[in-house]
Amino acid sequence: VLSAADKNNVKGIFTKIAGHAEEYGAEALERMFITYPSTKTYFPHFDLSHGSAQIKGHGKKVVAALIEAVNHIDDITGTLSKLSDLHAHKLRVDPVNFKLLGQCFLVVVAIHHPSALTPEVHASLDKFLCAVGTVLTAKYR
């Protein structure tokens, strides 16, 4: 459960992230594909080379969904319901991949905003990403 302080920390760090959705999303995806090669299996139709338009486009979608969740932080479940359906029923993405992508996203934020990612903000952002992952995997059960 996100506390009031967590919500403020997440909203604060996302003011720095929002203008870089495509860049940060693509970096997180590329990092995930390199670190966890098995995740590539969900993207057989993508050009997975560095800087590809498909990775940039999907990265932008990922971060846009996170921004939408931040904008509706008190109703992440309702906000991401359709996305949860898509990933559970149509795409059938292994739930562990949301955690892997979340970890990679945290690394990207740390690289670009080291001074803003204090231990408290890091913990809050991690809790938020875990909450998003929980929502996205809820329909698997």
Curated annotation (Swiss-Prot):
Residue ranges of domain Globin in the record: 1-141
Binding site for O2: H58
Tissue-specificity statement: Red blood cells.
InterPro entries listed in its UniProt record: Globin (IPR000971), Globin-like_sf (IPR009050), Globin/Proto (IPR012292), Hemoglobin_a-typ (IPR002338), Hemoglobin_oxygen_transport (IPR050056), Hemoglobin_pi (IPR002339)
Annotated residues for binding of heme b: H87
Pfam families according to UniProt: Globin
GO molecular function: haptoglobin binding; heme binding; iron ion binding; organic acid binding; oxygen binding; oxygen carrier activity; peroxidase activity
GO process annotations (BP): hydrogen peroxide catabolic process
Record's GO cellular component terms: blood microparticle; haptoglobin-hemoglobin complex; hemoglobin complex
Entry keywords, A to Z: Heme, Iron, Metal-binding, Oxygen transport, Transport
Its biological purpose: Involved in oxygen transport from the lung to the various peripheral tissues.
Family: Belongs to the globin family.
Note: This alpha chain is from the adult major tetrameric component, which has been called hemoglobin A or AII.
Protein name: Hemoglobin subunit alpha-A
Organism (species): Phasianus colchicus colchicus (Black-necked pheasant)
Name of encoding gene: HBAA
